[in-house]
Swiss-Prot record:
Record field: transmembrane: 25-45, 60-80, 99-119, 149-171, 178-198, 199-219, 242-262, 282-302, 324-344
Pfam family membership, one: NADH_dehy_S2_C
Protein name, entry field: NADH-ubiquinone oxidoreductase chain 2
Self-association state and partner proteins as the record states: Core subunit of respiratory chain NADH dehydrogenase (Complex I) which is composed of 45 different subunits.
Top-level taxon of origin: Eukaryota
Keyword annotations from UniProtKB, A to Z: Electron transport, Membrane, Mitochondrion, Mitochondrion inner membrane, NAD, Respiratory chain, Translocase, Transmembrane, Transmembrane helix, Transport, Ubiquinone
Keyword Electron transport part of the UniProt annotation: yes
Species whose genome carries this gene: Xenopus laevis (African clawed frog)
GO biological process assignments: mitochondrial electron transport, NADH to ubiquinone; mitochondrial respiratory chain complex I assembly
Top EC category: translocase
Similarity-based family: Belongs to the complex I subunit 2 family.
Organism ancestry: Eukaryota, Metazoa, Chordata, Craniata, Vertebrata
Length: 345
């Protein structure tokens, strides 16, 4: 891609995200989301491959439908109440349609079918942007309108997402699809806690962004997109591979790693809100996700593929990829647990 075009696309991607997040008017928020969608499509199609074109088309159609529903919801609310403010979403129909529109943009179940297919057709770098940066604006809008939303609807969407996210990743062999279902499951945890404690949703979102970014950076460093190629990662970058298993276990929510902290707090909060059945179901659904994370960990650490004697020497050559960001991300995604007691006070 032309450097000038690339800089314009990245600037639009960043600025319109901030417009959508900081706006208090529905029309401006919708405009920010729309331009943000249009800005990422050139990044999706920069590799001229049929899968990339198909992924960008699916993404555009899904996001266009979600944006149309969001605009309908805000127009309906403005027609009935005379208010365009995001904080004045009072009509029940508008609240329900707005929730569905934002969940469709995020890829929450049962509106999740586009996410694994789109992510599979993208490069790891674009997939990283789609799985992290593109979640910020819809989550910020959800955070603002959380008090007005229908709690049973949110809990149903959250529980469905955690179950489908865990169940869908069990039989996958493509790493990008596994990360897509992982994203769906994590978003389900966030939506489930949103009606009770929006602050915990922000904590969960922050740790999810760190862990997912780390995993995408690791996969980009070792050039792996399939489970079968993970077994050769030891010969490429031994130290990165050793730390990546901690990231995988952290994504699975095992203590005392970073991913355990938000799940612990969420279950504690749900139990205190007398929703013990929901908390138990969420905890059991996390076992589904943990299974395929453990499978990836087993392949990375305890298996080795047949290779020549020269293959074991590739790590001796200096890598040309910058690793400072990856090093920081690996530490944050694995060892943020020492600061967790401070969040209890």
């Amino acid at each position: 891609m032309n450097p000038i075009t690339f800089s314009v696309v990245l600037t639009s991607l960043a600025s319109e995200q901030f417009l959508a997040v900081s706006s208090s008017h529905w029309l401006l928020a919708w405009m920010g989301l729309e331009i943000n969608t249009l800005a990422i499509i050139p990044l999706m199609t920069q590799h001229k491959h049929p899968r990339a074109i198909e992924a960008s088309t699916k993404y555009f159609l899904t996001q266009a439908a979600a944006s149309a529903l969001l605009l309908f919801s805000s127009l309906n609310n403005a027609w009935l109440t005379g208010e365009w403010s995001i904080l004045d979403l009072t009509n029940p129909l508008s609240c329900a349609t707005m929730t569905i529109a934002i969940c469709m943009k995020l890829g929450l179940a049962p509106f999740h079918f586009w996410l694994p297919e789109v992510l599979q057709g993208l490069s790891l770098t674009t997939g990283l942007i789609l799985s992290t940066w593109q979640k910020l604006a819809p989550m910020a809008i959800l955070y603002q309108i959380a008090p007005m939303l229908n709690t049973p609807l949110l809990l149903t969407l959250g529980l469905t997402s955690t179950l489908i996210g865990g169940w869908g990743g069990l039989n996958q062999t493509q790493l990008r699809k596994i990360l897509a279902f992982s994203s769906i499951a994590h978003l389900g945890w966030m939506i489930s806690i949103l009606p009770f404690s929006p602050q915990l949703m922000i904590l969960n979102l922050t740790i999810y962004l760190i862990m997912t970014s780390t995993m995408f950076l690791v996969l980009k460093t070792i050039s792996s997109t399939k489970i079968s190629s993970l077994a050769t990662s030891w010969s490429k970058t031994p130290s990165t591979t050793a730390l990546s298993l901690l990231t995988l276990l952290s994504l699975g929510g095992l203590p005392p790693l970073s991913g355990f902290v938000p799940k612990w707090f969420i279950i504690q909060e749900l139990t205190s809100q007398n929703t013990t059945i929901l908390a138990t179901t969420l905890a059991l659904s996390a076992l589904l996700s943990l299974f395929f994370y453990l499978r990836l960990t087993y392949i990375v650490t305890l298996t080795s593929s047949p290779n020549t004697s020269n293959a074991s020497l590739t790590w001796r050559h200096h890598s040309k990829q910058p690793t400072l960001l990856l090093s920081i991300a690996l530490i944050l995604s694995s060892f943020i647990i020492p600061i967790s007691p401070l969040t209890l006070t």
